[in-house]
């Protein structure tokens, strides 16, 4: 008997697919580890993200970044080939990525339908794709995570053309490996539509059972154990056609959603059963208010009730119905415009009790869009969105709320008048918005000065393309082939390419204006660049993950030439800390007379990069935890090829510092070719206090120098800052620190050196300075400089360096590591510069300033199965602050590390507060400052452990007041004395540096500092 149910006809609807194929004798799993297949799976239409799966050391791969508040955040990917591919169910995985199941026939070997599974990371980057083929036709309908961390796929299978249909069960691991497959069926046809995990580790499947000899179909419920063996089954229904659509757990039993053919035989009614854990009916409810009602999806809500999504009315409105646990209907809501068909296929609940559906909306007779709509907990419609391209049909099959507050949707789309569909994965924000317009293009060396891209013209990688619309700014970066791709909202944008330095010029200095009128638009804009100055521009970076006493330390040195011509005979000079001993290097090293090591790089082409490793050993003796180790690298040529500032007098200041017995000696030297025309000043900081009386001024002739001597350093850390003359090229900040200068056996103060930046603001200089640690966390974030004092204060012009350290603390080798770091709003994402790393990686910056770093094929051994070097990894990147950050701005930063498919691990948080240097540094003398003529104050011992004595000489006082402050200026002690000798006990003072004031009769006598051990 012909099914008389009403149909809607779409030219590309899946219902018209027919298949003819031979049977395969064994299950076939196609795993698209080959990147070409992964690219083929992604239909590169405007809604798709371009994927470049390469592993270049310090290679900037395609990224999308939104610096302003865009109207929509999200993406849409299409997976498929030239035949039928559809998505039916989606999950967000524990690593915050996604796994999608459905069916496809584009990439199998026998032209039939197979189960199709795609796993992506949080940004939609394909991790793997697989096909599962055990017969003539296989289709997946649902997927759930199992208790052991794997996944169960439930669907249907037909072994041979004309054979009956069975329920098909597959269990796969996190990498898509097949653990087992099983079938369930009898003499008739059994089909599955949904599955739910049970508390005993097993699972229950809902579907339909059709009698072999009759047309009657019933709702089928099957209980399976954890290994896929059926323990019992039951059917429910009427003498007419009944179909089981969705299942959810409620209490100790289940709620079953199905459709039952009404008495007219033309349309369905919705049927809802609540059953106990053995399948016995507790209550039954029906919705039969109009000619047509269909249930598609059911969930258990936070209040213990049930929510249903489906279709109502002949003209098809989307339907949401809310029940309590006893089957009492709380409310019913239909969503639909007059004369516009809408259907709901899936539903999800948010933390506030609101509900979101997905399905389809018939925009016109030839255009169907994906529907997303939200209602509050009482059923009031909050918003409704239609996502789709006028040239394509899109339908949402499943929806889940994401941890980020948006939604992930799967389904299918297909082009108008095209029989075949593609699986789609759509990510939206919390309002159902997504970005679908894309601007692509090429950035290249314009050798013929025609400003259009010709074959043979060299691509430029790592260049930033900026798109501006009002206050909204979006960025893209070119990949290794010079290609960029940016997702944009609608509107008028100015696109401009930003050269990495001033040695380059571009064809379009003012940019190109583009108008994006509609969604799913696509434009191609190429940018040519040429040399403004023929000069190399060398950059260098050196890093190691951490320093540990008496250990091997491997430094990674990266270098690049972002200039316009080849750097001839380039080399890197390396200076090691005296606590480090050179062992070997992956590049031949020359020992220089001054103790430095020289590594010859040869010729480095424009836009070329490279790296090498330097192995060292850190001393076992005479090294304290918290003490620093410093290594500096300088790459040559370091030529400055632009016009010089006319104010510059050709002087160039360098500073040096040494500990000589009981004295710290700083040297300031002019190594430039010109004499200084103006006097400049230096600042000396002892630990974290600016000294008075020793800060030098200088006006040096070429080659001349001065010394600054500081006696009796008492183990403190001293740092000198010096100024360059006005107009000095580059960003040089002459500074040097001397740490641990004390008599043998005397204690030293550590932890002070890294609070200030080093002189490596110029790209051709890199300084790695770290505190020696006794232990390292399995994931850690290090920020440099760490900032001054308890508030970690830095200047508004200080660049920040971030190093992420990670160790494989699991029991299995890790193949892939991803780091995601959401930058503070005070950091300029466009200034992110990738640095050294333990392994090859690629870096992306996108959305509101998320830095994503991916290590593919890292092969990181478990901590208990290899040496530290093979269990740890690290990566460094640098970024500048946004201009004019106001005083008081707080910069917080924290990274998340993803090891393969595990739960992500968060690092510590690093924090800074912005102020103006040197205003935020307390200003005191090296020991004290006396404000009363003829008075002297002796302090002994200082530093002290239990008690310190302050003895006033030169004048008799009857009463003295002593105020003790911490470094933030907070008064923490106040004491009074009736003689000129003041004994101050440590009491509860923690180790550290404190300032004090000595006062008598309202007059300030003396200020200074106390050092507590």
Give each language-model segment a name.
Residues 119, 171, 223, 274, ...:
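Hydrophobic beta-strand positions
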């Amino acid at each position: 008997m012909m099914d008389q149910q009403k149909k809607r006809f779409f030219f590309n609807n899946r219902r018209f697919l027919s298949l003819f194929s031979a049977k395969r004798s064994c299950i076939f799993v196609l795993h698209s580890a080959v990147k070409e297949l992964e690219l083929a799976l992604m239909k590169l239409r405007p809604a798709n993200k371009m994927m470049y799966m390469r592993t270049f050391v310090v290679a900037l791969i395609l990224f999308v970044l939104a610096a302003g508040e865009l109207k929509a955040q999200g993406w849409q990917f299409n997976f498929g080939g030239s035949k039928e591919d559809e998505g039916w169910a989606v999950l967000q995985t524990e690593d915050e990525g996604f796994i999608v199941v459905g069916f496809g026939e584009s990439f199998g070997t026998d032209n039939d339908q197979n189960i199709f599974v795609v796993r992506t990371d949080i940004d939609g980057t394909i991790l793997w794709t697989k096909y599962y083929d055990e017969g003539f036709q296989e289709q997946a309908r649902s997927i759930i995570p199992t208790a052991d961390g794997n996944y169960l796929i439930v669907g249907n299978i037909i072994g041979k053309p004309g054979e009956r249909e069975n329920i098909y069960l597959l269990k796969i691991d996190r990498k898509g490996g097949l653990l087992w497959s099983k079938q369930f069926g009898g003499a008739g046809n059994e089909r599955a539509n949904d599955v739910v995990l049970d508390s005993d580790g097993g699972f229950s499947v809902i579907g339909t059972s059709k009698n072999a000899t009759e047309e009657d179909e019933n709702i089928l419920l099957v209980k399976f154990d954890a290994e896929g063996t059926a323990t019992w089954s039951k059917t429910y229904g009427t003498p007419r056609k009944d179909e089981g659509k969705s299942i959810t757990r409620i209490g100790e039993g289940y709620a079953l959603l199905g459709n039952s053919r009404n008495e007219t035989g033309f349309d369905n009614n919705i049927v809802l059963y609540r059953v106990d854990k053995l399948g016995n009916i507790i209550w039954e409810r029906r919705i039969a208010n109009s000619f047509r009602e269909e249930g598609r999806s059911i969930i258990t809500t936070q209040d213990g009730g049930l929510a249903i999504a489906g279709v109502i009315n002949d003209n098809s409105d989307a339907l949401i119905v809310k029940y309590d646990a006893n089957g009492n209907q709380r409310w019913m809501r239909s969503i639909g415009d007059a004369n516009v068909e809408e259907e709901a296929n899936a539903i999800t609940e948010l933390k506030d009790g609101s509900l979101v559906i997905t399905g389809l909306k018939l925009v016109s007779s030839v255009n169907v869009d994906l529907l997303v709509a939200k209602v509050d907990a009482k059923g009031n419609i909050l918003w409704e969105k239609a996502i789709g391209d006028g040239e394509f049909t899109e339908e949402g099959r499943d929806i889940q709320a994401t941890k980020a507050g948006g939604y992930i949707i799967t389904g299918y789309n297909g082009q108008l008048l095209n029989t075949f569909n593609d699986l789609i994965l759509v990510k939206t924000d919390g309002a159902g918005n997504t970005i679908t317009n894309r601007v692509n293009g090429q950035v290249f060396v314009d050798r013929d000065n025609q400003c259009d891209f010709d074959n043979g013209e060299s691509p430029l990688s790592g260049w930033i393309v900026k798109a501006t619309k009002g206050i909204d700014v979006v960025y893209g970066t070119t990949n290794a082939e010079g290609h960029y791709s940016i997702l944009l909202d609608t509107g008028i944008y100015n696109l401009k390419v930003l050269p990495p330095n001033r040695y380059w010029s571009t064809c379009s200095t003012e940019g190109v204006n583009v108008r994006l009128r509609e969604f799913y638009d696509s434009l191609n804009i190429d940018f040519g660049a040429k040399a403004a100055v023929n000069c190399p521009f060398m950059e260098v970076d050196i890093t190691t993950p951490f320093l540990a006493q008496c250990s091997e330390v491997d430094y990674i040195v990266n270098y690049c030439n972002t200039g316009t011509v080849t750097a001839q005979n380039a080399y890197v000079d390396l200076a090691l800390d005296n606590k480090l001993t050179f062992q070997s290097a992956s590049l031949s090293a020359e020992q220089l007379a001054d103790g430095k090591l020289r590594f010859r790089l040869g010729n480095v082409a424009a836009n070329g990069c490279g790296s090498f490793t330097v192995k060292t050993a850190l001393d076992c003796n005479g090294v304290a935890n918290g003490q620093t180790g410093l290594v500096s690298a300088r790459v040559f040529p370091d030529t400055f090829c632009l016009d010089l500032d006319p104010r510059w007098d050709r002087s160039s200041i360098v500073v040096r510092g040494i500990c000589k017995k009981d004295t710290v000696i700083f040297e300031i030297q002019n190594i430039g070719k010109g004499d200084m025309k103006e006097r400049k000043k230096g600042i000396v900081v002892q630990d974290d206090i600016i000294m008075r009386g020793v800060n030098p001024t200088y006006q040096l002739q070429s080659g001349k120098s001065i010394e600054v001597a500081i006696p009796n350093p008492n183990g403190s850390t001293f740092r000198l800052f010096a100024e360059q003359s006005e107009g000095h090229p580059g960003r040089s900040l002459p500074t040097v620190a001397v740490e641990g200068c004390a008599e043998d056996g005397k204690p030293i103060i550590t932890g002070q050196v890294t609070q200030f930046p080093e002189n490596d603001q110029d790209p051709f200089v890199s300084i790695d300075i770290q505190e020696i640690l006794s232990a390292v966390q399995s994931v850690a974030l290090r920020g440099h400089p760490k900032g001054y004092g308890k508030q970690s204060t830095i200047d508004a012009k200080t660049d920040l360096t971030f190093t992420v350290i990670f160790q494989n603390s699991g029991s299995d080798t890790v193949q892939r590591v991803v780091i995601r770091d959401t930058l503070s709003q005070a950091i300029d994402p466009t200034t992110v510069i990738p640095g050294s790393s333990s392994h090859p990686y690629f870096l992306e910056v996108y959305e509101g300033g998320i830095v994503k770093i991916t290590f593919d094929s890292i092969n990181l051994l478990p901590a208990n199965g290899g040496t530290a070097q093979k269990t740890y990894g690290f990566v460094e990147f640098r970024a500048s602050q946004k201009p004019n950050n106001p005083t008081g701005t707080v910069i917080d930063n924290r990274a998340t590390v993803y090891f393969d498919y595990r739960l992500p691990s968060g690092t510590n948080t690093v924090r800074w507060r912005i102020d103006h240097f040197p205003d935020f540094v307390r200003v005191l003398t090296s020991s004290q400052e006396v404000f009363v003529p003829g008075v002297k104050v002796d302090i002994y011992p200082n530093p002290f452990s239990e008690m310190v004595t302050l003895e006033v000489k030169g004048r008799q006082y009857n009463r003295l007041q002593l105020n003790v402050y911490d470094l933030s200026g907070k008064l923490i002690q106040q004491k009074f004395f009736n003689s000129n000798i003041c004994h101050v006990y440590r009491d509860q003072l923690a180790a550290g540096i404190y300032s004090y004031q000595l006062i008598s009769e309202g007059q300030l006598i003396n200020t200074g500092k106390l050092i507590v051990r």
